[in-house]
């Protein structure tokens, strides 16, 4: 039996993508079992594989882990991407929460009701430009290192890179005023494991399209 982690999710970004990113950055190969129908999801539930009847779920080290943050915490700890002490870990957690907040805001736009789309898009752009990106630009300036925390790669660097790439897809002009973040994006993107994950043919998922959204609605009933 393969010793690789096995990821159970829909064949799209969603809440699994940050997990894919972190595993790839750690140089960990993984397999994926895609949920392609309501029956696939129901079988996982009936077999007792989903603690809260939800995905993402990752099989790793004999466990079936649910909840995105719990999975990320385990991977980061296992592969030494969680800082060198409690203070670094606290900073990593704080920065990560902000990153995930903005990531969620941007990703939710694709399933936003049409009558709310304009207002929510404007809010996401405002939060990106005036709250979140300035905060991380300030961190990079004050810390003065190649990384957000300490002087080596941690999970939060990968989470921030993923976010910056989403921002670039969303509206590339939002990055214009943040030279340190642009340099950070280039720097982290050039790391060997990350560079490999960014290449065509990797397990990185493309932006979701209308067909995928419709398929996901049928499976997950949202």
UniProtKB/Swiss-Prot annotation:
GST N-terminal domain mapped to chain residues: 3-83
Oxidoreductase found in the keyword field: yes
InterPro entries hit by this protein: Glutathione-S-Trfase_C-like, Glutathione-S-Trfase_C_sf, Glutathione_S-Trfase_N, GST_alpha, GST_C, GST_superfamily, Thioredoxin-like_sf
Covalent S-S links between cysteines: none
PROSITE patterns named among the record's database cross-references: GST_CTER, GST_NTER
GO biological-process terms attached to the record: epithelial cell differentiation; glutathione derivative biosynthetic process; glutathione metabolic process; linoleic acid metabolic process; prostaglandin metabolic process; response to nutrient levels; response to xenobiotic stimulus; xenobiotic catabolic process
Sites where the protein binds glutathione: 9, 45, 54-55, 67-68
Superkingdom classification of source: Eukaryota
Residues modified to N6-succinyllysine: 4
Gene Ontology molecular function: dinitrosyl-iron complex binding; fatty acid binding; glutathione binding; glutathione peroxidase activity; glutathione transferase activity; protein homodimerization activity; steroid Delta-isomerase activity
UniProt keywords, alphabetically: Acetylation, Cytoplasm, Isomerase, Lipid metabolism, Oxidoreductase, Peroxidase, Transferase
EC code: 2.5.1.18, 1.11.1.-, 5.3.3.-
Modified residues (N-acetylmethionine): 1
Catalytic activity of the protein: RX + glutathione = an S-substituted glutathione + a halide anion + H(+); prostaglandin A2 + glutathione = prostaglandin A2-S-(R)-glutathione; prostaglandin J2 + glutathione = prostaglandin J2-S-(R)-glutathione; (13S)-hydroperoxy-(9Z,11E)-octadecadienoate + 2 glutathione = (13S)-hydroxy-(9Z,11E)-octadecadienoate + glutathione disulfide + H2O
CC annotations in GO: cytosol
Compartments where found: Cytoplasm
Family: Belongs to the GST superfamily. Alpha family.
Subunit structure: Homodimer. Homodimer or heterodimer of GSTA1 and GSTA2.
Function, as annotated: Glutathione S-transferase that catalyzes the nucleophilic attack of the sulfur atom of glutathione on the electrophilic groups of a wide range of exogenous and endogenous compounds. Involved in the formation of glutathione conjugates of both prostaglandin A2 (PGA2) and prostaglandin J2 (PGJ2). It also catalyzes the isomerization of D5-androstene-3,17-dione (AD) into D4-androstene-3,17-dione and may therefore play an important role in hormone biosynthesis.
Note: In addition to its enzymatic activity, the homodimer of Ya chains, called ligandin, binds various organic anions, xenobiotics, and azocarcinogen dyes.
Cross-referenced PANTHER family: GLUTATHIONE S-TRANSFERASE, GLUTATHIONE S-TRANSFERASE-RELATED
Name the record gives this protein: Glutathione S-transferase alpha-1
Gene name linked to the record: Gsta1
């Amino acid at each position: 039996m393969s010793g690789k982690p096995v990821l159970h999710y829909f064949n799209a970004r969603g809440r699994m993508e940050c997990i894919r990113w972190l595993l790839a950055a750690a140089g960990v190969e993984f397999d994926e079992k895609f949920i392609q129908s309501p029956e696939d999801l129901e079988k996982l539930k009936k077999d007792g594989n989903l603690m809260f009847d939800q995905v993402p779920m990752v099989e790793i080290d004999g466990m079936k882990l649910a909840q995105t943050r719990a999975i990320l915490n385990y991977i980061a700890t296992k592969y030494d991407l969680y800082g060198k002490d409690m203070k670094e870990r606290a900073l990593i957690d704080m920065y990560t929460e902000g990153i995930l907040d903005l990531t969620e805001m941007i990703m939710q736009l694709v399933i936003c009701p049409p009558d709310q789309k304009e207002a929510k898009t404007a809010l996401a752009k405002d939060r990106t430009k005036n709250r979140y990106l300035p905060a991380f630009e300030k961190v990079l300036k004050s810390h003065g290192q190649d990384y957000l925390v300490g002087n080596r790669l941690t999970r939060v660097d990968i989470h921030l890179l993923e976010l910056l790439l989403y921002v670039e897809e969303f509206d590339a002009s939002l990055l214009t005023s943040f030279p340190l973040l642009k340099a950070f994006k280039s720097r982290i993107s050039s790391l060997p494991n990350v560079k490999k994950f960014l290449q065509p043919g990797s397990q990185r998922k493309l932006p979701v399209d209308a067909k995928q959204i419709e398929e996901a609605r049928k499976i997950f009933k949202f």
